[in-house]
From Swiss-Prot:
Species name: Kosmotoga olearia (strain ATCC BAA-1733 / DSM 21960 / TBF 19.5.1)
UniProt subunit comment: Part of the 50S ribosomal subunit.
Family annotation (InterPro entries): Ribosomal_uL6-like (IPR000702), Ribosomal_uL6-like_a/b-dom_sf (IPR036789), Ribosomal_uL6_a/b-dom (IPR020040), Ribosomal_uL6_bac-type (IPR019906)
GO biological process assignments: cytoplasmic translation
Function field: This protein binds to the 23S rRNA, and is important in its secondary structure. It is located near the subunit interface in the base of the L7/L12 stalk, and near the tRNA binding site of the peptidyltransferase center.
Superkingdom classification of source: Bacteria
One annotated GO molecular function: structural constituent of ribosome
GO CC terms, sorted: cytosolic large ribosomal subunit
This protein's name: Large ribosomal subunit protein uL6
Organism taxonomic ancestry: Bacteria, Thermotogati, Thermotogota, Thermotogae, Kosmotogales
Keyword set includes Transport: no
Pfam families in the cross-refs: Ribosomal_L6
Keyword annotations from UniProtKB, A to Z: Ribonucleoprotein, Ribosomal protein, RNA-binding, rRNA-binding
Amino acid sequence: MSRLIKKPIPVPNGVQVEIKENIIKVKGPKGELSQEYLPYVKIEQKEDGIWVTPNEEMVRRQSDRRKLAMFSGTYWALVRNMIIGVTQGYQKELEIKGVGYRAQLQGKKLVLNLGYAHPVEIEPPEGITIEVPNPTSIIVKGIDKYLVGQVAANIRRWREPIVYSGKGIRYKGEYVRTKVGKKV
């Protein structure tokens, strides 16, 4: 059984949680998130926080208990991430390494010069803000942890770090292992 589900998820002041049928909605100072959940879990709000437990009605045979525990741990983490997102928010920082590689904002659109014949334009989805404090760093911010990570990964995918020179877009603090090139 998942160890996470043995304790409740604390709900800070200023956060409202609404649970209806198979949807949980979390409202906070930074915004609102909702998540649909499967009938394998029961999500209940009590005085000490939100409890995510396996739905014992879904057990048909003994092997189902392990599956229910897996779903319970997953939804526990998803609900906790929603609460953190609406209170603190999430951000991912990216660094650009390479001669002539740079980023700039045009309105909300991110424009990257990465050595291609044309600049790469990226329109952030709703709920995501992109900041460019200097031409070689990008900050992706939002309240949805999954969406922030996905947008950062999509930006990084345009020019992943090259293993021989280390040039490209990388996460801040990411270690890129470089190889030695051919010797002539």
